[in-house]
């Protein structure tokens, strides 16, 4: 997490092997082939362009590693190219954009379904629940030297 206060709350709660104060994309870029699985629930709503993050996730995964995440769904998915910043300061993403961004980063989409990802103001917030696997061909998601 970026917030040391949130890390402290997580530390108090317990149950974690490691807690790190870091920006997500930077952290993934510094951990080449370290993970078999990356799970990100309700985090990527703070990213518009997912390209760099997905490249870094592929870089951080071991061969054939898995990536599971959620993003908010655009209201009218067919008419929205890519992603947009909403009035609640969260981004929503179209299905086509997520699919294209995964492919460009070297992932194979294994499952993508509409789901309620959270409740907000008493209303269900619809999103995409995504499961992807790192493909054999991998673009370089390593940090620039």
Regions found by a protein language model. Name each.
Residues 25-38:
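A short acidic, Gly/Pro-enriched loop at the edge of an enzyme's catalytic core
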Residues 90-106, 112:
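Short alpha-helix
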Residues 21, 40-43:
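A short beta-strand submotif of the Rossmann-like class I SAM-dependent methyltransferase core
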